Amino acid sequence: MLRDLFVKKKKYAAIPSEQVRKDVPDGVMTKCPECKKIMYTKELLKNLKVCVNCGYHHPMNAWERLDSILDEGSFREYDKEMVSLNPLEFPGYEEKLESDRKKTELNEAVVTGEGTIDDMLVVVAVMDSRFRMGSMGSVVGEKIARAVEKAYDLQVPFIIFTASGGARMQEGILSLMQMAKTSVALKKHSNAGGLFISVMTHPTTGGVSASFASLGDYNLAEPGALIGFAGRRVIEQTVREKLPEDFQTAEFLLDHGQLDAVVHRDDMRESLRKILEVHQGGGMAVWQS
């Protein structure tokens, strides 16, 4: 009818078609989970995966971490071929391991080896949370223990970057015993005067936080890293108290004397270099045969 010509029409927003969305290839853009800013992935990578807007530290994989701290071309990997089995015949475990191997191109949740920082030799271990959430099973514990023993033999410092959900439940008591094994290896290294630097990244929890991650001569962490043993909700239900908002963050632990420093990723290599420089002498303050 004629009156319909004068009725105010509703305004509609144009929704991009699926074809338009597909014009932007996967991986080109990254959204920061903290400030929600969308940025070019290449810009994020150039900034060591730190958000250019809010400073949020995005997770790094093992190889990105090694590239950010070691001299170029200096890394030599240890025990690359070690892989986990399924000793307890846990249902579905082998399939999950194989899936993570394909997804990450890693054989396990930790990469160990030796390299140099400003020409100073170190043994280093880097955990990768993409593989079984960085959980510690038999192979992870064995690789870390072997790396510590190598540092002992070479009389050089040992550095570890942790990122883990804790002990691996599919391996039961075999995973829990890795807490003791790695701690004993570090004690031997320490008794000989060996330097151990632990750098805790997001997240470092469970059996990893309760063992080797907290045993450093220097305990460092990245900003905002979640560090703790049990989960926040479990603790609140146990103590029946409301915990502070920043509870179990790196900054909270620093304020309460459980960390030596919270170090921005941009400053990590230089901070490690300064510590190593202070402890020159093969990494051993007092070497005891």
UniProtKB/Swiss-Prot annotation:
Q: How is the cofactor bound?
A: Binds 1 zinc ion per subunit.
Q: Which cofactor does it need?
A: Zn(2+)
PROSITE patterns reported for this sequence = COA_CT_NTER
Chain sites annotated for binding Zn(2+):
32, 35, 51, 54
EC number(s): the record gives: 2.1.3.15
Record's catalysed reaction(s): N(6)-carboxybiotinyl-L-lysyl-[protein] + acetyl-CoA = N(6)-biotinyl-L-lysyl-[protein] + malonyl-CoA
Positions of the CoA carboxyltransferase N-terminal domain: 28-289
Q: Give its localization.
A: Cytoplasm
Quaternary structure, per UniProt, is:
Acetyl-CoA carboxylase is a heterohexamer composed of biotin carboxyl carrier protein (AccB), biotin carboxylase (AccC) and two subunits each of ACCase subunit alpha (AccA) and ACCase subunit beta (AccD).
- What is this protein identified as? Acetyl-coenzyme A carboxylase carboxyl transferase subunit beta
Question: Which organism is this protein's natural source?
Answer: Bacillus cereus (strain G9842)
Which gene is annotated as encoding this protein in its UniProt record? accD
